[in-house]
Amino acid sequence: MPRVYIGRLSYQARERDVERFFKGYGKILEVDLKNGYGFVEFDDLRDADDAVYELNGKDLCGERVIVEHARGPRRDGSYGSGRSGYGYRRSGRDKYGPPTRTEYRLIVENLSSRCSWQDLKDYMRQAGEVTYADAHKGRKNEGVIEFVSYSDMKRALEKLDGTEVNGRKIRLVEDKPGSRRRRSYSRSRSHSRSRSRSRHSRKSRSRSGSSKSSHSKSRSRSRSGSHSRSKSRSRSQSRSRSKKEKSRSPSKDNKSRSRSRSPDKSRSKSKDHAEDKLQNNDSAGKAKSHSPSRHDSKSRSRSQERRAEEERRRSVSRARSQEKSRSQEKSLLKSRSRSRSRSRSRSKDKRKGRKRSRDESRSRSRSKSERSRKHSSKRDSKVSSSSSSSKKKKDTDHSRSPSRSVSKEREHAKAESGQRGSRAEGESEAPNPEPRARSRSTSKSKPNVPAESRSRSKSASKTRSRSKSPSRSASRSPSRSRSRSHSRS
């Protein structure tokens, strides 16, 4: 039965759409849709010819399709006269999933550099169904073709070996499991894979190292608060400064140490950058000979974006930690100033209290000393007045009656003054007026005694008072010494 091939078929096309597209040209027996292409089987050959003639290049589900007669036997991968191959090109491995690998492999040598794997696959379809094709991957000017069956591979080896493709005669060699060619090809393939793996591992290591250093960097910066310097300054400056600050660091505080740490880390960061650049250059130079250079560039751009985002987050966290540390330092300074002011006020109060107590003790001792001086001056005046009165009495012995009255009046006045003095002086000076009272009682009780005996009694009382006055002065002198000792203390 005649079959029609449909190329450039839209992925959205269904069997109903294809049936509608070919409706009116004849009876359709079967519609077989593949990825990007399909087959339609007609009942009559003339209907198939009409469909191919009129529908080639028409739109089907938004795509301009290719409609041709199907070449080769139906549902069979055997060789035919060859197809146009355009639809099969579109159904390559880059769009329709991974190809199936088989052991029926041929090595194509002396392949033209203009011949792609798609061209090679289309050319090899003359011999049979091709499952996998590759060109210039392991080695330049060399390709690989894999077939579904061993018979297809043998047919291609017999029929297509020595034919010309793009002006070059190709040479087909069977790739056996024990052959040198397979070994060398697999070696070269594994070598290229290991290269790419080592590249990726180097990159990942350098990235992880740089991320670790950046984490520790953020910690040291949050401690010290000198984080904006190492970023804003150039790398060469940070290197020279790190050398200077290393020599200065033992004499300075923790701040200088953290500053010397941060340039060291910036130096390590710049080294990481330089290593990454060298590795990227190496990988770019190697990727020129291989195909996956786009993947490397994409991964680089992604890693740069991630680094930029991480640096932004770190800067925000550093600013927050700086503000927190500043507020903590301010609160500490405030509490210290408060405690200092409190201690100062307490010490001032203590000093004032001590000064007051000293002033009070001094004033007390002064008042005591002044009182004792006054009392001693009063006593001296009393003694002198009593001695003068006794002299006057001796002179006036001849006139007894007037002298008695005068002496009595004087004694009364002295007694009154003595009582006043005794009241003012207190308990320590109370026994002073006793001899005066005794002398008064003796003088009053013996009015008939002659004047000589009276004068003797008066003189005896004077001697008594004199003898008692030194004892008073002796009793006052220890009180003065006590007051002086108080004032000294």
From Swiss-Prot:
It comes from the Eukaryota. Extensively phosphorylated on serine residues in the RS domain. Residues 2-72, 104-177 form the RRM domain. One of its GO terms (biological process) is hematopoietic progenitor cell differentiation. The modification Phosphoserine is found at S78, S84, S289, S291, S293, S441, S453, S455. InterPro entries: Nucleotide-bd_a/b_plait_sf, RBD_domain_sf, RRM2_SRSF4/6, RRM_dom, RRT5_SRSF_SR. The keyword Manganese does not apply. GO terms for molecular function: RNA binding. The keyword RNA-binding applies. It is found in: Nucleus speckle. Found in a pre-mRNA splicing complex with SRSF4/SFRS4, SRSF5/SFRS5, SNRNP70, SNRPA1, SRRM1 and SRRM2. Interacts with PNN. PANTHER family: RNA RECOGNITION MOTIF RRM DOMAIN CONTAINING PROTEIN (PTHR23003), SERINE_ARGININE-RICH SPLICING FACTOR 4 (PTHR23003:SF45). Belongs to the splicing factor SR family. This is Serine/arginine-rich splicing factor 4.
